[in-house]
Amino acid sequence: LLNLARRDDGIKPEIAEVSPQFFKTTFANYELIASENDRIFDYENRIYRPFMTDQLLLKQLMTILFDNAIKYTEEDGKIEFVVHATDRHLYLTVTDNGIGISAADKKKIFDRFYRVDKARTRQKGGFGLGLSLAKQIVDALRGTISVKDNKPRGTIFEVKIAIQSPSKRKNK
């Protein structure tokens, strides 16, 4: 995380094929981590065919969002992760019923070294790099990331990144 955050030359994606199995494996790992942390983890994996993107960057992005949800959701809290795709875009939605993010903080959470409520993050750990790095990854993958409230409590992160089908990539 720190190595990527230190880079000033930007993140350069290495595009390769990502199989549907990638999500099954990743979500199985997240289930274990959530269980070990006394959180409830649900997911909906609607990826049924391979697509092209940078798998390592995708995994880092997903893990940053998942780790934040774990960190700011209390015991017995719930985290949901939904993935689906069209021919041109991959969509990730991470929802939690944690402590949420204020409107003022939402404007700054993607800034490097910004930490929501310093006292709260000091307890939880972190350098204020995770969501900044998530934004850099999303930008490198030609996408968007947004955050909104999960009423009555919690946060929803929505990500949309550009992808290609394997057949289109091979023809270029």
PLM ranges: what are they?
Residues 101-115:
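Short conserved segment of the HATPase_c
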Residues 69-70:
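Short helix-loop "hinge" at the ATP-lid/N-box region of the Bergerat-fold HATPase_c
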Residues 40-49:
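Conserved catalytic submotifs in the C-terminal HATPase_c
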